[in-house]
Every structure is written in structure tokens, then in C-alpha cells.
């Protein structure tokens, strides 16, 4: 198998520096946690389907493999926004809803901050536009007590463009800040590794009678994962994939 789309940065030196920065933050996460701070790998898993099998799965028997029914009843979809705590391996303050808007993401971050309001927070996120939104800038400015004039979206100041908003959100002097991974580097964000666990352990073989059932089962799995399975991922990136 050969991937057809890989990161081909315009500036390989800058790209390498960004990757190195993320790797260094992962290595620093335990020390940051010891000082009361949080390093979270954050992203959305969209389009999670509430699929109910049209007939019961026939269980494994001597001489016979398990036989699932492949006809489904479709009950809708949900979006999970999750934070993977790099230092502890726990999934923190997940939110699940029908959409992924800038308000949804800002609300998720607000809910996360509320778990430890005075702590330092570093969120590792990708380049999605909702991770550089006006709502997020206003949230961070208020939470950090920043009185600076923010300007106006598409016209002036911090709010003018995605690049100006990203510059503000990634300011290392802020108590709450965001670190952006380069484009086409989902492998660099540890939450993606946890999403694969969610798929294998729950979603792939799941049977969900409604979106409410799906939401409750995901939250129950997260609680179970945090209690029995959570541990930091072993960071091995030297041109190779992540390993658990």
C-alpha cells in the first residue's frame, strides 16, 4: 500500500521545527503536570453513526465464527470532541453533540478549563478553522484576563484573520494557549491514536438504538478506559508511527 497524500511542506525547515516543537512538548508533559499544568491533545471525531443491527449477532460457537448482521437501522450521527491528557493517558472533559461549529469547540474548551480554572493549559490541535475562531479568542482573552482590544473579524486587530487569531491563541505568554500541528500530520496528534482505540473497542462492533444510546455508551467507555486502561502513550517518533 502506498499513501497518495503526504505532507509536502513549502518550507521543510519550518515544518521540521513545528514537528520538533510538538515532540518536545510531549516529552515535557510529565514535568508540566507535576507543576499543576495540563498538556492535552485535542480533536474531533465527526460522523459517528448510531447504527442498530437489523437482527441479533449470532455468537461464536464451536466450529463457527461469530456472525453479525450487516443490515443496519440508522439513527443519526454525533460528533465527539475529546482531550487526551498526554501526561496521564486519561481522556478529559469529553463533549458529544450533533455538530462541530466554532461555538461547539469553544464550549468544549470552556468546559475543559472549568475542571481546573486557574491552571496553565496547552492544547495541541490541528489547523482546522474552528481551532482559530473568534469565539475561541474571546474565550481565552476572558479566561486569561486579557484586556487588550481584540479588533474586528476580517477588518483589524487580533480578530482580523485566521493567522492573527492563531498568533494570539499560540502566544507562549498566555496561561491558556494552543500549539498547532502542521498540515497533513494527524499522526502527530496523540488523540488520533486514542480514537483508534475507541473504534476498535466500541464503535466497530457496537449496536446503538439511538443517538442518546450512542452518546451514553461512548461516555461509559471513556469512564471505563480512564479507570482501567489509561496510560501515557510511548512517544517514539523518529520517522516512525506512534506506539501504545
Residue ranges of each PLM-predicted region?
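Short glycine-/polar-rich loops that comprise or flank the Walker A/P-loop
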Residues: 36-37, 119-120, 172-177
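Acidic/histidine-rich, metal-coordinating catalytic segments
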Residues: 119-131, 154-156
Amino acid at each position: 500500500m502506498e499513501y497518495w497524500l503526504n505532507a509536502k511542506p513549502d518550507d521543510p525547515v519550518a515544518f521540521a521545527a513545528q514537528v520538533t516543537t510538538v515532540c518536545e512538548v510531549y516529552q515535557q508533559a510529565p514535568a508540566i503536570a507535576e507543576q499543576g499544568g495540563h498538556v492535552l491533545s485535542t480533536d474531533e471525531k465527526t460522523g459517528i453513526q448510531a447504527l442498530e443491527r437489523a437482527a441479533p449477532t449470532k455468537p461464536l460457537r464451536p466450529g463457527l465464527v461469530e456472525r453479525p448482521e450487516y443490515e443496519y437501522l440508522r439513527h443519526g450521527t454525533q460528533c465527539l470532541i475529546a482531550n487526551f491528557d498526554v501526561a496521564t493517558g486519561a481522556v478529559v472533559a469529553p463533549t458529544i453533540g450533533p455538530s462541530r461549529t466554532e461555538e461547539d469547540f469553544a464550549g468544549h474548551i470552556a468546559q475543559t478549563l472549568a475542571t481546573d480554572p486557574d491552571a496553565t493549559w496547552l492544547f495541541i490541535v490541528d489547523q482546522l478553522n474552528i481551532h482559530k475562531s473568534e469565539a475561541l479568542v474571546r474565550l481565552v482573552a476572558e479566561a486569561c484576563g486579557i484586556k487588550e482590544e481584540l479588533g474586528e473579524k476580517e477588518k483589524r486587530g487580533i480578530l482580523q484573520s485566521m493567522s492573527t487569531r492563531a498568533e494570539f491563541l499560540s502566544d507562549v505568554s498566555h496561561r491558556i494557549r494552543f500549539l498547532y500541528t502542521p498540515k497533513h500530520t494527524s499522526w502527530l496528534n496523540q488523540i488520533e491514536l486514542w480514537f483508534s482505540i475507541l473504534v476498535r473497542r466500541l464503535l466497530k462492533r457496537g449496536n446503538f438504538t439511538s443517538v442518546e444510546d450512542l452518546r451514553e455508551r461512548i461516555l461509559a467507555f471513556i469512564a471505563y478506559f480512564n479507570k482501567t486502561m489509561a496510560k501515557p502513550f510511548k512517544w517514539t517518533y523518529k520517522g516512525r508511527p506512534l506506539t501504545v
